[in-house]
Amino acid sequence: MSDEFSLADALPEQSSAKPPAVTNTKAGHSSQGWPGSSPWSNPSAPPAMPSGLPPSSAAPSTVPFGPVPTGMYPSMPPTGPPPGPPGPFPPPGPSCPPPGVPYPAPAVPGPGPTGPYATPNMPMPELPRPYGAPTDPAAAGSLGPWGPMSSGPWAPGIAGQHPNMPYRSPGPYPTVPPPVSGAPPVPWGTVPPGAWGPAAPYPGPAGSYPTPAPHPALNNPYQVPSGPAGAPPMPGGPHSYH
């Protein structure tokens, strides 16, 4: 056993002064236990592009409605009218005349009147006459606002919407007859003056009424038995047994 002291034997295994063990690895091959470059191990490395998205340098898409839309839903095409200044309203032109201007006369005038109407081939129907009116129009009475009328106050020749209910004639009415001479008229609700005569005695009854009597007992099986007067015993109360 050698008594030589070696400094490498006194240093721990993780010390940097201890020479590392020589491994039999070929040049150009990395260790299997360490991953490749990543943003955590190599901050200067460019970030990796997520799979599924096109690179930023890709050519713009040629779609019929313009460039690729941007926003919350880029896959939905834009809706509505194309961008641009709105057109004038109402549209210019003679489509509608300005307000307050009368319409022009038609270029082609319509047909004028053709003359008197032709005589109808059927006679006009006769108007209904009121009840009791004469058949000959010449014999009818004076024509009033409600049809032919006679001179009497309630003549039968009066016409109207209901011929059987005559209307008063607009002519002069007969004079109201004077009141009959005698007792003066008394206003309603007053007692006329004068004696009313003695008070007559009130007539008595024509005969005497029969004395009331108890009705005869009928053949009723549910007769109430005769007993002492008073209220019947209450149900559930004390009973007297005989």
Curated annotation (Swiss-Prot):
Composition bias type Low complexity, residue spans: 30-43, 192-210
Location of N-acetylserine modifications: S2
Keyword ATP-binding recorded: no
Keyword terms, alphabetized: Acetylation, Phosphoprotein
Pro residues bias: start-end ranges: 44-53, 75-114
Biased composition (Polar residues): 13-29
One Pfam family it belongs to: MISS
Stretch list, region Disordered: 1-145, 192-242
Positions where Phosphoserine occurs in the chain: S2, S6, S15
Keyword Phosphoprotein recorded: yes
Family as reported in the entry's similarity comment: Belongs to the MISS family.
PANTHER family named among the record's database cross-references: MAPK-INTERACTING AND SPINDLE-STABILIZING PROTEIN-LIKE (PTHR35973:SF1)
Protein name (Swiss-Prot/TrEMBL): MAPK-interacting and spindle-stabilizing protein-like
Organism placement in taxonomy: Eukaryota, Metazoa, Chordata, Craniata, Vertebrata
Gene for this chain: Mapk1ip1l
